[in-house]
């Protein structure tokens, strides 16, 4: 019996993170499905990714920023859940270690949807999507 592949939605991405999967692996799996399954894109981002534990707030916010950027690139409607203020971090999150020039580069090159959520990623996070 053949099992059909089910693409990983934003909601399922957060569920995997909550279950203990390395967050970067879950995030990359979501990005791969976005990249290689264009016919599924609207379904991938339709549901708001819930979180209950404080340490998962960063990942939910990262997903919101990611969805906003990816939908804008593809001229798809951005889901309303991405504008929920709960997806904005109170404290800055720098995705790369470093201070001084590194942080300066991150602040200058991070796309708006990430910066608006206080996530400083630089401009390379989504380069393969």
Language-model segments: which ranges?
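Charged, helix-prone or intrinsically disordered regulatory segments positioned adjacent to compact structured domains
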Residues: 2-77
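Charge-dense, extended regions
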Residues: 70-129
